[in-house]
Amino acid sequence: MKVAPSLLSADFMHLAKEIESVSNADFLHVDVMDGHYVPNLTMGPVVLENVTQMSQVPLDVHLMVENASFFAELFAPLKPQIISIHAENEKHPHRVLQLIKNLGITPGIVLNPHTHEESIKYLLESVGLVLLMSVNPGFGGQKFLDLVLEKCLKVKELIKRYNPSCLLEVDGGVNDKNIFELQQAGVDVVVSGSYIFKSKDRKLAIEGLQNVRQSLA
């Protein structure tokens, strides 16, 4: 299992130390919120540029914004590995996904908990990652919604049919109590914020999620 600690849960007063404490992660998950699509504001490109100078861990950028094309171009110079947009918020998602791909970045598509998985069927060939929200977006520290496990199974079947190389990622309320179920549901990447950043040993917490089979053996 690949693990992406969510910087939304980090202490920004000590950002360098926080990032070093999760340096064994597979990705750093960055939530970009504009205060319009979701009722919260987070980091911009200046903060994220500092992050790239502190860490070699690839960036996984999740855009929760009204104008995804603008923000994709704004963050592209920082060379994130992934930029994901919300299916619910784009009139022309293919166009935005192609823009992200043309910028040399893996495009991803995001589904909120209430959005039907069939809505992304015709987008799957255009993305390298599907991100399923297992909480309602906008704030960290929320409880995992169990209904998303069934959705994972359905999305994984769509991925197998339309784009087998596409990764399945889940974000929200992920911890050591539900990681095995997520693995069984076909999830490839988990985003975890509060669980990791509240752990006494963050690197050990990450390893526990990464090595889910061994930790449960």
From Swiss-Prot:
Keyword presence, Signal: no
EC number, as in UniProt: 5.1.3.1
Binding annotation for substrate: 6, 62, 138-141, 171-173, 193-194
GO terms, molecular function: D-ribulose-phosphate 3-epimerase activity; metal ion binding
Catalysed conversion reaction: D-ribulose 5-phosphate = D-xylulose 5-phosphate
Binding note for cofactor: Binds 1 divalent metal cation per subunit.
Gene3D superfamilies in alphabetical order: Aldolase class I
InterPro entries: Aldolase_TIM (IPR013785), Ribul_P_3_epim (IPR026019), Ribul_P_3_epim-like (IPR000056), RibuloseP-bd_barrel (IPR011060)
Entry GO CC: cytosol
Superkingdom, taxonomy of origin: Bacteria
Needed cofactors: a divalent metal cation
Annotated GO biological process: carbohydrate metabolic process; pentose catabolic process; pentose-phosphate shunt, non-oxidative branch
UniProt pathway: Carbohydrate degradation
Keywords: Carbohydrate metabolism, Isomerase, Metal-binding
Family: Belongs to the ribulose-phosphate 3-epimerase family.
Described purpose of this protein according to its UniProt entry: Catalyzes the reversible epimerization of D-ribulose 5-phosphate to D-xylulose 5-phosphate.
PANTHER family: RIBULOSE-5-PHOSPHATE-3-EPIMERASE
Protein name according to UniProt: Ribulose-phosphate 3-epimerase
Organism: Helicobacter pylori (strain ATCC 700392 / 26695) (Campylobacter pylori)
Lineage, opening ranks: Bacteria, Pseudomonadati, Campylobacterota, Epsilonproteobacteria, Campylobacterales
Gene name in the database record: rpe
